Amino acid sequence: MMGLMPVRAAAGVPGRNLQGEKGETVICRGVEAHTSGPMLQVGQVAPDFHAVNAKMEEVSLSDFKGKKVILNIFPSLDTPTCALSVRQFNARAAGLENTVVLCISMDLPFAQSRFCSTEGLDNVIPLSVFRSRDFVAHYGLQLADGPLEGLMARAV
């Protein structure tokens, strides 16, 4: 399920990923924007990636091998919709067995930690990809244009 809904195949001059593949068109704050590459589709294997946790430690998707993993990807905790999604995932994650919910954004780990602490969120794992371009390259989610250019499109 995508938070920013793809409306059609990318047209015009959308972004391109490192392999030169065209991105997808999404609606961001009522304006068309393009992702840096094609988004993963249901059934595709999620590529491994590196991110930073609240302790400034590098983590990878493979660190959670053997567990079910839900990726909640969003532009920033400083947007109401993204903050709400993290709160809702936290509430639902409490009842999930052998499952981790990774809330991934380009927010700095300090901001993510402060948000989760202030909100009392302890059932999700906030991860920052602020220095990890492999994530945005492999997942095709970086916004190549539009009002939030440079951040990531929302995706689950």
Residue ranges and their predicted role:
Residues 2-156:
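Chalcogenol-based redox active-site neighborhoods
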